Amino acid sequence: MQRVRRLGRRLRATPTAVEVHHGRGPGSQGDVLFAGPLPPAPTGIATYDRAVLEGLDRIGFTDRVRMETLWPVGTQDAGRFPGYHLGVFQLGNNVEFHLEIYRAAYLTSALVVLHDLALDDFVRGLKAAGEPLGYMAAREAGRLCDELTDPDVIRNEPLREPWCAHVVRRARGVIVHSDFGRRYLAGFGVRTPVFVVPHPAIEGPEAFSTSAPRGRELRASAGDPPFLVVAPGDMNEAKQLDALVRSASVLGTGSHVAIVGRRIEGYEPEAAIEAAGAAGQVSVHADVSDADFLAWLAAADAVVDLRFPHRGEVSGSLSRAMQAGVPSVVSATGTYLDVPDDTVLRVAPGPTDVSELAHVLARLRDDAALRSQLGAAAARHAEHLRTREATARGYERAITETLALVRDPGRKAMAIWGKSLVDAGITEDMVAQGFGMEYARALRSFEPGPEVAASQRNFERSP
């Protein structure tokens, strides 16, 4: 409660209006502003953002487009946002890191990057602090929740209400990291352009080979077990760590589970370990360095990365495990269903069944050829995405197409005209019959001809 009160004081002290001075309109500051956490911020989105920016540099995008990076984002930055044609805003489910970024998405044309489809905790935090945007987001989510009928969505409580709907429908473009994200947004009628961009490779393959010696040391510290299972990432209840701990007891001696990652307030894996009597078979390694995190992955025979409830996120830990060539066990839900079938083993969605998980892990333990096959396929897939610069190219396309949209001189006029038609009682059926179409056709005269469009494309490609 003290944290909520502090946040409330912070919000109440924030000006609710932004003064934009003459001469600071779109483009006066630059083409694009990229706003999101960067290292050493203690969130996985920080390393993600660093990898994205490095990729855009490698492909020469930042030589062609004026793009600035902003972190941290504070209330004092509010007046800057309207000076850019487009903001690329990284949004996660944490008020501490994403409050001002979320606000910024309402101050300028926005390309929103959704790291969590379910912004439930974020929106509740806004409401608890009395932030008007929180109430607007909650109202929109409640209005649209009946549109979501996918059984996989209904199974996962945080996804049942589209908490992201308000900001997504306000945005000019949206980036998600799997096709599940695109399907989820389509499920409640989003018409904003959606771009599916894969999670970036955080490291190159050499990072895992150089981690191998440290990995052997860490494996030895766990008793040098014949079969080492690593559960990487934030330690929380949704990772189904309690079920993993109990499955370790079923596996018996010769297997060891290492839980490695950041501690999250409100969950302690030690309680589950004690309850299962698995102290000798499970170890906890909290808040390790990034180097040791990679070393644990390099040392692992298998990785377990489960989710229930699922929030529609793509797991950065799973991406790293695939890069390391480690076979992984995941939940058959949401974004995990978009991972190639030959790179992972899946357990049933919902609360993890201990006996099923133990059976799958025993299968991996006893079949070295299967482990090698899955790990090699995972590494090939990750390397294919990395060498293609799939993430950077995806961002390039999303930013370029969204910039073209916001620069279109007919777009705003069309939006105003469309609203006027609605106010006048014109329905979609009436539009199909031709009502209001003469003005819309006239606006097409603002579109560049083929020669101009080709010239613009060549200019954008030139260094």
Which stretches of residues belong to each language-model region?
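Nucleotide-activated donor-binding/catalytic signature segment of Leloir-type glycosyltransferases, i.e.
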Residues: 144-145, 269-291
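Acidic donor-binding loop of glycosyltransferase active sites
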Residues: 172, 297-312, 326
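Glycosyltransferase donor-sugar binding loop
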Residues: 232, 256-270
